[in-house]
Amino acid sequence: MSSTTVKNLVNQPYKYGFVTNIEADAIPRGLSEDVVRLISAKKNEPEFMLDFRLRAYRHWLTMAEPTWPAVHYPPIDYQDIIYYSAPKQSKKKLESLDEVDPALLETFEKLGIPLSEQKRLSNVAVDAIFDSVSIGTTFKEKLAEDGVIFCSISEALQEHPDLVQKYLGSVVPTADNFFAALNSAVFSDGSFVFIPKGVKCPMELSTYFRINNGDTGQFERTLIIAEEGASVSYLEGCTAPMYDTNQLHAAVVELVALDNADIKYSTVQNWYAGDENGKGGIYNFVTKRGLCKGVNSKISWTQVETGSAITWKYPSCVLVGDNSVGEFYSIALTNNKQQADTGTKMIHIGKNTRSIIISKGISAGNSANSYRGLVKMGPKAQGARNYSQCDSMLIGDRAAANTFPYIQVDNNTAKVEHEASTSKIGEDQLFYFAQRGISEEDAVSMLVSGFCKDVLNELPMEFAAEADKLLSLKLEGTVG
């Protein structure tokens, strides 16, 4: 495969890189206890929330930034970040989406996320987050008819403080890791979902994250609780403008599944990845963890990672309930000078727990793509089983792929299977396609799509085609 083809395929324009010119209410740069108190005061939070933040901030001051991921970047100046920026509004509390600034509605429509009543998606409820705040949530009232709570976490703190206090930090504690502690101190919004006992959520729930301000970090918090026998499918998407500087995105996601509950969490991550020389792009340092607390509970993570200059995330499952199930399906595509260190942890505690890991890494350009996984069978995980499959594909001759599996088994009745492969798109494959009149670009697209099909099949139907298209767009021109 010629280097020109590879270059053309990789260097696709990023169509979400525009900036919305809108007046913002932003606090000064820098992080201190006063800034933490200011964020809490701006959001008029209950006392327990301020205590939570301050505890996290004090922990964070004692922690060191992790150096073990296989990624390299210049030191981050945490005093040069704006930790809260929100679009200026005429009213403190908006009663409906009709009161949202038209420029914001237009931004989300341009991103393919219409929020106005006439144009909104009919079977998907959306929480739209812009910089540090949620600007609106669709179908809240309709979902409430089934007892489903879907709102921003700021609203949940006002309307359902007991639920937030009970579950916030129960899966990812404030001192869990450096970036989770930072998030716990300064997060300003995110989504809250509560599915009551026995309810199957009647529609897909989705949150769309948009970073706009070039000096602002985004630190959202997502908390999803499924009570006994409840089920929900949730999708998140994200984009950001093209800046020459890097922005920090440090989110935390906590999922709690009680007896016989089922949570499916899907991500299509398309943050700005920087230019072909590695200038600009988002640092995506995220902590995601699900707790299968109840018997027969199930949590499934599906992710398609194509953006960010640097990605550092490991959506994980802690399988406490007997017969609980954890699943992780991932596609991580890197090109140009992107770096990704992603993977999962499956921690088996209960009896007869099961987990499956399917990871597909695709490396093109000068990028580096690492899979890092932990499978841990606890001493009481009688009859537990895990199956892991980690496949890497290299496009071109300058990309790198690494796999770091870690397996710990403390119960002799547990079974663990692990297989891994590395492949490269070869001249013989492209020649075979050419013989049938298929261009090199189409051939690469078809090979990648086939390589990823096990994961794409796990996405909700309406998003699978979008993700497949996104992979093709990201690779257009990698051959030439």
Curated annotation (Swiss-Prot):
Q: Which GO terms describe its biological process?
A: iron-sulfur cluster assembly
Q: Which InterPro entries match?
A: Fe-S_cluster_assembly_SufBD, SUF_FeS_clus_asmbl_SufB, SUF_FeS_clus_asmbl_SufBD_core, SUF_FeS_clus_asmbl_SufBD_sf, SufBD_N
Similarity comment text for this entry: Belongs to the iron-sulfur cluster assembly SufBD family.
Xref: NCBIfam families: PRK11814.1 (NF008773), sufB (TIGR01980)
Q: What is this protein called?
A: Iron-sulfur cluster assembly SufBD family protein slr0074
Biological source species: Synechocystis sp. (strain ATCC 27184 / PCC 6803 / Kazusa)
